Amino acid sequence: DTKYALGSVLNHVLLHQTIIGTEAMAQLEMANDYPDVIVGCTGGGSNFAGIAFPFLGAQLRGGKKVRIVAVEPSACPSLTRGRYAYDFGDTAHLTPLTKMHTLGSTFTPPGFHAGGLRYHGMAPLVSHIKELGLIEAVGYQQLQCFEAGVQFARAEGIVPAPEANHAVKGAIDEAIRCREEGVSRAILFNLCGHGHFDMQAYIDYFGGKLQDLDYDEAELAMALAGLPSVKAA
């Protein structure tokens, strides 16, 4: 007998991950600080929700307003280019149908190095708050994210995972925006993983073997055409 448990996309997984943001709030309280902007990378949504949801919850209960930015790969842009529709949360179609931003459960993203972000659909709760306008979403190409990761490693002595490079790139862009606007903002981002097991990706980057990848429009259209038909009750 086999049981199938997803580690992302489903809402209960997001709930468990909120320990990340809860701990971040406690740490910031110790530092007597609070973020103006929160940046997180997104694939299925668990890491992003983990850092963002506690702060969003505080905001909705009357707390300080924060800008929340979800960063995803341009090659797998479920939030920025996907359709808000009912779909399966997995390619095997074992999950319940949930309403999400999706590229279609049969969509196969190109093989870029941030494997944890190669997911066709976004968690229902993350999708819902995007529809409500509570978060923003932006897509980045692979090479600019690796460039940001190298910059971070040289400055901080920590090599980020390719997935985390997306959040690093988003945070750097927010800092540049502050400089251009002449304002000071506290920027919080989640470095969700180290790159110790991704050295080959960095070797390929420095060797000029990586390239920016885009999704196939025809394949995306075919995947979206196969979305389940759901009739309203």
Positions of predicted regions on the chain:
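A short, small-residue-rich loop immediately preceding and capping a beta-strand
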Residues: 34-48, 68, 185-191
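Short glycine/serine/threonine-rich phosphate/pyrophosphate-binding segments
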Residues: 41-52, 78-80, 164-172, 196-199
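Phosphate/ATP-binding catalytic cores across multiple sugar-kinase/actin-like superfamilies
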Residues: 19-34, 173-177
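Conserved PLP-enzyme active-site core in the AAT-like
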Residues: 17-21, 48-49, 53
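C-terminal, active-site-flanking charged/polar segments
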Residues: 67, 188, 192-201, 205-206
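Buried hydrophobic packing segments
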Residues: 25-27, 51-55, 149, 167-175
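Active-site/ligand-binding loops adjacent to catalytic centers
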Residues: 1-14, 20, 31-32, 57-60, ...
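C-terminal structured "cap/appendage" subdomains that terminate the fold
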Residues: 153-195
